[in-house]
């Protein structure tokens, strides 16, 4: 923040020692010709007061609260704790602001340093610093405990002109609030370090975004933590909630019942779920200040055990806040009541949830296993959705999962179409077709209907005759009955008995000899010697070297072929054709 020429403070002296406030005073007056850094001012002020104390020791005087010299509005004050012992003070000796050296004594307690802010001249509030010598000075008995009074509320002022300067006495109102929280704590936190840590904290937002406006019209101080938009400030709009009310009490709220923990629990949600507030400062005593209704003053609270811990406390991520202090008198649990039976409607709301909600005490139905489905399938009767059949060797399914019989399923699989429901009518036998008659012989019964060259239906006999001879079959050949070929089944045992005769290689029809003829012309004693006859025939064929000599004499085979004398192949063929069975064999 840019500093003007008149933007620095003017040190003044009040009290009995005001007469000798010349160059020998610990805080000599300086002209505001050029802005000075707080470090140099404090160092020069502390180092030039060697002859002020009664013992002659060098000491630094911190400003003491003078309630009569403050011309601010009534009831507007701010608590500010003194600087206490710290290793920083021990290392720097008297150079630390507000820290007295060893053996130092304060001669007068009327000395105070009035920081007159020229930018805030319109406001009557002043920054007053209380003295720290009440505990270390030998005159501590003379100082009452009420010396830790409150100062003017910083919430009614904007940021000071020297607020952003490095090493300044007060960097932000958050530092003052932190000092107010640790009023009686023996911990000295340099404001230069506090100011450097404040910008890195995520839960301390910038200025001008406070939830409440001040009576003076100025925006919220940049140091106060701001509450989130969706949650009310913890503390009822107080210091920890994001702002303090002015004299009019525009943004004031009633403090919590607990003086040590002024923040109030958040109102319960409709569904009982945890909420994540954004403006909650997690530390007991960090924002320990409540806003009174009419006066608007910050109460002086925060014990010794509540040391400066707001900067070290981290904000939890799970929405709940745990404190390391165990003396909450009236702090209610943050989570509130458990979940109510009425569930909130959400994007995943299904009838299953409603059924489970209505049947809170009823057990869930046990899911059926595959065995139950198998029993159900066996018990119920299936029906083909295509033809309506209820019996089939194999049940199939179509693309939609419906059952099909084996025939309909195969037809649909092979042709890609549903099997036609209208079955083709069975063909009537051709011999019994009504209205059909042969165009040649006019018969109505036949084993096979044919068509002539003109396309007319003819019986099997007329059609075959026309096909073989090329002329129509004469009507004289017409027969009333149909002559059919007699096909008798072959006997396996009889064919084995005649196997010897079929092995004779001299006749071309030896392989097609009929077994019936063998049984007719063979006597029982001859059948027993059939194997021996075959052997003698083969030997006779092997002994004949002349192929023209075909005279074979069957010894003992006169009964087999009676009167058959084979002299040449021509005679054999002629003799075979004369037999009755030859016509059937050669046909």
Swiss-Prot record:
- Quote the subcellular location field of this record: Nucleus
Q: Renumbered to this chain, where is the cross-link Glycyl lysine isopeptide (Lys-Gly) (interchain with G-Cter in SUMO2)?
A: 423, 467, 478
Protein's GO biological process? animal organ formation; cardiac muscle cell differentiation; cardiac muscle cell proliferation; cardiac muscle hypertrophy in response to stress; cardiac muscle tissue development; cardiac vascular smooth muscle cell differentiation; cell fate commitment; cellular response to BMP stimulus
List the GO molecular function terms. chromatin binding; cis-regulatory region sequence-specific DNA binding; DNA binding; DNA-binding transcription factor activity; DNA-binding transcription factor activity, RNA polymerase II-specific; DNA-binding transcription factor binding; double-stranded DNA binding; NFAT protein binding
Q: Which UniProt keywords apply?
A: Activator, DNA-binding, Isopeptide bond, Metal-binding, Nucleus, Phosphoprotein, Repeat, Transcription, Transcription regulation, Ubl conjugation, Zinc, Zinc-finger
Q: Where is the composition biased (Gly residues)?
A: 234-251
Tell me which Gene3D superfamilies the record gives: Erythroid Transcription Factor GATA-1, subunit A
Instruction: Spell out the GO cellular component terms annotated for this protein, sorted alphabetically and separated by semicolons.
Output: nucleus; transcription regulator complex
According to the UniProt record, list the residues that bear Phosphoserine. 266
**InterPro entries reported for this sequence:** GATA_N (IPR008013), Transcription_factor_GATA (IPR039355), Znf_GATA (IPR000679), Znf_NHR/GATA (IPR013088)
Q: Which regions are flagged for Low complexity bias?
A: 17-47, 210-233, 502-523
Q: Which Pfam families match?
A: GATA (PF00320), GATA-N (PF05349)
User: Which residues lie within the region annotated Disordered?
Assistant: 17-73, 209-259, 480-532
ZnF regions (GATA-type) run across 384-408, 438-462
- Compositional bias ranges of the Basic residues kind: 484-493
Q: In which tissues is it expressed?
A: Expressed in aortic endothelial cells, with low expression in the descending thoracic aorta and the outer curvature of the aortic arch, where pulsatory shear stress exists, and high in the inner curvature of the aortic arch, where oscillatory shear stress prevails (at protein level). Expressed predominantly in gastric mucosa and at much lower levels in the intestine.
Domain commentary? The GATA-type zinc fingers mediate interaction with LMCD1.
Function, please? Transcriptional activator that regulates SEMA3C and PLXNA2. May regulate genes that protect epithelial cells from bacterial infection. Involved in gene regulation specifically in the gastric epithelium. Involved in bone morphogenetic protein (BMP)-mediated cardiac-specific gene expression. Binds to BMP response element (BMPRE) DNA sequences within cardiac activating regions.
> How does the record describe its quaternary structure?
Interacts with LMCD1.
**What name is this protein filed under?**
Transcription factor GATA-6
Question: Which species is listed as the source?
Answer: Rattus norvegicus
């Amino acid at each position: 923040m840019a500093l003007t020429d008149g933007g620095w403070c003017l040190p003044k002296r009040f009290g009995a020692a005001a007469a000798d406030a010349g160059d020998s005073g610990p805080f000599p007056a300086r002209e505001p010709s050029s802005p000075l850094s707080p470090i140099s001012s404090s160092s020069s002020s502390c180092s030039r007061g060697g002859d002020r104390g009664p013992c002659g020791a060098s000491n630094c005087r911190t400003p003491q609260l003078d309630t009569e010299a403050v011309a601010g509005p009534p009831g507007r004050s701010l608590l500010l704790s003194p600087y206490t012992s710290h290793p920083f003070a021990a290392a720097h000796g008297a150079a630390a602001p507000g820290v007295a050296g060893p053996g130092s004594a304060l001669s007068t307690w009327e000395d105070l340093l009035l920081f007159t802010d020229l930018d805030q001249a319109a406001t009557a509030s002043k920054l007053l610093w209380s003295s720290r010598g009440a505990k270390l000075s030998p005159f501590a008995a003379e100082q009452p405990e009420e010396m830790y009074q409150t100062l003017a509320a910083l919430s009614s002022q904007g940021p000071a002109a020297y607020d952003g300067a490095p090493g300044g006495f007060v960097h932000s109102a958050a530092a003052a609030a932190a000092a107010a929280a640790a009023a009686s704590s023996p911990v000295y936190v340099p404001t230069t370090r506090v100011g450097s840590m404040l910008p890195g904290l995520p839960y301390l937002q910038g200025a001008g975004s406070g939830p409440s406006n001040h009576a003076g019209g100025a925006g919220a101080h940049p140091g106060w933590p701001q509450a989130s938009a969706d949650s009310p400030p913890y503390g009822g709009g107080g210091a920890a909630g994001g702002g303090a009310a002015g004299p009019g009490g525009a943004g004031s709220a009633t403090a919590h019942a607990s003086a040590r923990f002024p923040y109030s629990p958040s109102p319960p949600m409709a569904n009982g779920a945890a909420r994540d507030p954004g403006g909650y400062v997690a530390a007991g005593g960090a924002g320990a200040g409540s806003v009174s209704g009419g006066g608007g003053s910050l109460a002086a609270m925060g014990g010794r055990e509540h040391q400066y811990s707001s900067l070290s406390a981290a904000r939890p991520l799970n929405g709940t806040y745990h404190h390391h202090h165990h003396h909450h008198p009236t702090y209610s649990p943050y989570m509130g009541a458990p979940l109510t039976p009425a569930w909130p409607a959400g994007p995943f709301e299904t009838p299953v949830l409603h059924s489970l909600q209505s049947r809170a005490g009823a057990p869930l139905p046990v899911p059926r296993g595959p065995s139950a489905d198998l029993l159900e399938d066996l018990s119920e009767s299936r029906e083909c959705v295509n033809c309506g059949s209820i019996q089939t060797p194999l049940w199939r399914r179509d693309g939609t999962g419906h059952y099909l019989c084996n025939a309909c399923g195969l037809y649909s699989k092979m042709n890609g179409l549903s099997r036609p429901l209208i079955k083709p009518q069975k063909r009537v036998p051709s011999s019994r077709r009504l209205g059909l008659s042969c165009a040649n012989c006019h018969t109505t019964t036949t084993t096979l209907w044919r068509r002539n060259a003109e396309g007319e239906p003819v019986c099997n006999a007329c059609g075959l005759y026309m096909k073989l001879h090329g002329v129509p079959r004469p009507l004289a050949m017409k027969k009333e009955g149909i002559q059919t070929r007699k096909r008798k089944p072959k006997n396996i045992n009889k064919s084995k008995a005649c196997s010897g005769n079929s092995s004779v290689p001299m006749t071309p029809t030896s392989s097609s000899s009929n077994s019936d003829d063998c049984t007719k012309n063979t006597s029982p004693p001859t059948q027993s010697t059939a194997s021996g006859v075959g052997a003698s025939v083969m030997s006779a064929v092997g002994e004949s070297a002349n192929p023209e000599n075909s005279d074979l004499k069957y010894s003992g085979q006169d009964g087999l072929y009676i009167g058959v004398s084979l002299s040449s192949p021509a005679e054999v063929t002629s003799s075979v054709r004369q037999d009755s069975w030859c016509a059937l064999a050669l046909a």
